[in-house]
Design a protein with these regions (language model features):
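A short beta-strand motif characteristic of beta-propeller blades
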Residues: 4-6, 56-58, 107-108, 163-164, ...
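Acidic/polar residues in short coil/turn loops that connect beta-strands
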Residues: 31, 47-49, 80-81, 97-99, ...
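Tandem repeat domain/solenoid detector
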Residues: 16, 30-33, 80-83, 116-117, ...
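Conserved beta-strand position repeated across blades of beta-propeller domains
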Residues: 18, 27, 69, 77, ...
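Signature tryptophan residues that serve as conserved aromatic anchors
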Residues: 35-37, 65, 85-87, 115, ...
Length: 290
């Protein structure tokens, strides 16, 4: 019920930290070692087995990891050479290996280099950002998650190899994939959304029914956006002036507006106070006061 320090050199200069929904947690140490722990049902801890680990274990022997991610039941990371790796559950082809085979150890995504960062949703999609500002996605496409401007249809095919989201000026490390909603920040400070719009999760000030969706990126009102976090039908984002804004489901009061009504907001609404960081969880948000 209170924070406990983990073994290792996490606090003396870690490069990346990740926390999954049902999967593993982990971090890249300052020495380039990747360690994971937690649920390992689909091999998402990269140990070539399905054993649960309650303390950090090293992934392989490599010491050139740059960043890591944990999402749903899949994990992965980038290396200093710019290569991209993923492992764990692959039921929708989300690992990007051109197959539906689960992986219990790190497996390289294609042969490209220049990969910068990764984000992932609950279980069915991953998003990969390249250093050249291009954004790529894999996995389920039921609600248009892949941003390919395909009409809503249960028959929309998942993609097991990365496909590019339109545009070439996506900002590094500022992409977010939630339950069934996706967001991307561009270098010009504009914020874009696509996928499922139930509860107003995409911030479009429009239809908030459970059946509305956008299968290609649409701009969220406003400019000068600087960060975005989402998890389950709700999102929080910051602007360069230090203000923070929320939208989506408010059924549990998770939007921080001192009330549980309205139960949904379909356009960005400012949170009172001065904050340095806010992240979105499942029916909750956490933040640091400035």
């Amino acid at each position: 019920s209170s924070p406990k320090q983990l073994p290792g050199t996490w606090s003396s200069g870690y490069n990346s930290i990740a926390c999954g929904r049902h999967g593993g947690q982990g971090a890249v140490q300052a020495d380039g070692v990747l360690k994971l722990w937690g649920n390992n049902q689909y091999g998402q801890l990269g140990q070539s087995n399905n054993t649960l680990y309650s303390s950090p274990v090293q992934v392989g022997t490599d010491t050139d990891w740059k960043a890591c991610f944990a999402s749903g039941l899949s994990c992965g990371g980038t290396k200093t050479a710019g290569t991209l790796w993923s492992w764990g559950r692959n039921n929708n082809g989300q690992l990007g290996h051109n197959s539906l085979t689960d992986r219990v150890a790190p497996f390289q995504v294609g042969t490209d280099t220049g990969w910068d960062s990764i984000s992932g949703g609950w279980d069915g999609n991953l998003a990969f950002l390249k250093e050249n500002g291009t954004l790529w996605v894999t996995g389920d496409n039921y609600y248009g998650q892949l941003g390919q401007n395909q009409a809503y249809a249960p028959s929309n095919k998942a993609r097991s190899s990365p496909v590019q989201i339109p545009g070439t000026n996506w900002a590094k490390t500022n992409q977010a994939v939630g339950f069934q909603e996706s967001f991307g920040l561009k270098t010009d400070g504009t914020l874009w959304a696509w996928q499922y719009n139930g509860e107003g999760a995409l911030g479009q000030n429009s239809n908030v029914s459970n059946n509305s969706f956008y299968s290609s990126p649409v701009q969220i009102p406003g400019t000068n956006w600087s960060d975005i976090s989402c998890r389950y039908k709700a999102a929080v984002a910051s602007k360069t002036d230090g203000t923070w804004w929320v939208w989506g489901s408010n059924a549990e009061g998770q939007l921080g507006l001192s009330q549980a009504t309205p139960v949904k907001l379909s356009s960005p609404t400012q949170i009172p106070g001065v904050w340095s960081q806010i992240i979105s969880g499942h029916a909750a948000m956490l933040g640091f006061k400035a």
